[in-house]
Amino acid sequence: LKEVDMRNFEEPEDYDKGTVSDEVPDIVTSYETPTALGDDMMDTAVEYMGDLYSLPAPVSAFTANGWEIQDAEDTPYVEGGGIAFIDMMKNNQSIHFSVYNETENATALENCFVRELSFATYDPESIEMKLSGDITLGADKAELIKMADEKGYISEENDDYLRIYPNKDSKIRNYVEFWFNKDEDSNKAASVTAHHE
């Protein structure tokens, strides 16, 4: 067992979500949209469906680019330090997102952050994603490992997955991960994930 992710989906009766703040948190207002992808695969800049984001990116950065939160009334705000699972739609494509409130107070969904984006060969063609370093689907496994080695990053292979991260302390907080479909081509990336906290 290398990683555990635990969540309680039942809210206790006496649970206090904290004070709801109407203000847009500083962490959201200070977010800057990148102007270009970086040269390094671990750069936080990601191109997703034609728009640039720097992960973690606030939900408001997505809505500014035409994404619409589905059923927002079901989860109008998220408790301080909490997580919500939402669907957002753009170009008739609905994507499931995990969003995190990085502040102490409860806040609106738009003020929460997306930490992870992914894209796979089985997704519709209208969904596109590119990592910094111009990396996308079809990336060669050996070349990815070589690029990581040149930067001094750690490459870890586990079954059909390759995870690359800067150092052992960032293994679950900042990484890029690739899945290789051995039934098609075990050397070409069939999915790409970027995760930055």
Feature locations, PLM:
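Short N-terminal edge-element motif at the start of the domain
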Residues: 19-58
